[in-house]
A protein has these predicted regions:
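A structural signal for multi-pass alpha-helical bundles of membrane permease subunits
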Residues: 31-314
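Short, intrinsically disordered terminal tails adjacent to the first/last structured region
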Residues: 1-23
C-alpha cells in the first residue's frame, strides 16, 4: 500500500516595505541655505534688472504712456498697428539690416586674413597683436571724434589724400550714398581686433601634424589653408558671425555721434529711432512697442542661426 506524499507549498517572501526617505540632515539643510544665500544677489539682480524691465516694457507697449504723463491708459495693440504702418520705422530697420550686412562681411573676412598672416610666423607677433586689438579698447566717443575729423570735408585726412591723387573731395558724412559706408569703415577699424584674436587663437589650436602631413603630400600654403585651416575654423566662424550680426543689429553709438542719423535719415538705425520716439517724441508706449518688434526680429534671427548650426553639425 503506497502512501502519497504531499509537498507543502513554498512560502513566498513578502515584498519588502519601501524604506522611508531619509530625513535631510542638518548639514544638508545648512548647505542648501548657504547655496540660496550666495545665489540671492544674482537672483535679485536678475529679477530687478532683467525680468521686471521686460515685463514693465511689455505692459508699457500696450499703453499710451508719454513723458508728459498724458494718455497713459491701456490702448491695446494700437502702438503695434501704428508701428507696422510707420514708413520711418521700416526705413530705420532697413538701414540697420543694411549696416549689418555690409559690416559683418569685412569684419569676418579681414579678421580671418589678418589672423592668418600673423599665424604664418611674422616677426614681433606681440606688436601685430597689439596693433590690431588696441582700437577695440577705445571708447566709441573717441573713435567717432577721430573719424569725424578724418572725414572733415576741408581738413580731413581722407580728402587730403584724395586731393594728392587728383580726386575731388568727398562729403563723407553729408552724402546719403556715402555716409553709411563711412560709418562702416570706422566700425571695422574699431572692432575688428576682437574677431582677429578669436581667429588667431583658433588657428594656433589646430594641430601642426595636419600641416606636416599635407606638406609631405606636396600641398602648398594655399591648399593647406583651404583644405585644413578653413574647415577647422568652421565653429569659430559660426560663432563670430552670430556675435557680429547681433552686435551690428544693435548699432547706435557711432552712428549717433558721427551723423546723428543723417543726412536725411540715411544712417538712422532702429535703435536710434526707438530712442527718438521715446525721448524726443515723448512717446514711451510707442517706443516700447517698436522695441518689442525689434526684439522679435532679433529672436527670429538668433533661432534661425541656431537651427542652421544644429542642422550643419547633425
Amino acid at each position: 500500500m503506497s502512501t502519497a506524499r504531499t509537498t507543502a507549498p513554498a512560502k513566498t517572501s513578502a515584498p519588502a516595505a519601501k524604506s522611508a526617505p531619509a530625513a535631510t540632515s542638518p548639514r544638508s539643510r545648512r548647505d542648501n541655505i548657504h547655496g540660496w544665500a550666495f545665489s540671492a544677489p544674482f537672483l535679485v539682480f536678475f529679477l530687478l534688472f532683467l525680468v521686471w524691465p521686460m515685463i514693465s516694457g511689455a505692459i508699457m507697449s500696450l499703453t499710451g504712456k508719454s513723458l508728459t504723463g498724458a494718455n497713459s491708459g491701456i490702448i491695446g495693440l494700437a502702438n503695434y498697428a501704428e508701428a507696422f504702418a510707420d514708413a520711418d520705422m521700416w526705413r530705420s530697420l532697413g538701414n540697420t539690416l543694411y549696416f549689418t550686412l555690409i559690416s559683418t562681411v569685412p569684419l569676418v573676412v579681414i579678421a580671418l586674413a589678418l589672423a592668418a598672416l600673423v599665424n604664418m610666423g611674422l616677426p614681433a607677433q606681440w606688436l601685430w597683436r597689439l596693433s590690431f586689438f588696441s582700437p577695440f579698447l577705445l571708447a566709441s566717443t573717441v573713435v567717432s571724434l577721430f573719424f569725424a575729423w578724418m572725414y572733415n570735408p576741408e581738413l580731413g585726412l581722407f580728402n587730403d589724400l584724395l586731393a594728392k591723387v587728383g580726386i575731388p573731395p568727398v562729403a563723407w558724412l553729408n552724402d546719403p550714398a556715402v555716409a553709411m559706408w563711412a560709418v562702416v569703415i570706422a566700425t571695422v577699424w574699431w572692432t575688428i581686433g576682437f574677431n582677429f584674436l578669436l581667429y588667431l587663437a583658433a588657428l594656433q589650436n589646430i594641430p601642426q601634424q595636419h600641416y606636416e602631413a599635407a606638406s609631405l603630400d606636396g600641398a602648398g600654403g594655399w591648399r593647406q589653408f583651404f583644405s585644413i585651416s578653413l574647415p577647422q575654423l568652421g565653429p569659430t566662424t559660426v560663432m563670430i558671425v552670430i556675435l557680429q550680426i547681433l552686435a551690428s543689429l544693435k548699432v547706435f553709438d557711432q552712428i549717433y555721434q558721427m551723423t546723428e542719423g543723417g543726412p536725411g535719415g540715411a544712417t538712422r538705425s532702429i535703435v536710434q529711432y526707438i530712442f527718438e520716439a521715446g525721448f524726443t517724441g515723448y512717446r514711451l508706449g510707442y517706443s516700447a512697442a517698436i522695441s518689442y518688434i525689434f526684439f522679435g526680429l532679433i529672436l527670429l534671427i538668433a533661432l534661425a542661426q541656431v537651427f542652421a548650426t544644429r542642422k550643419r553639425s547633425a
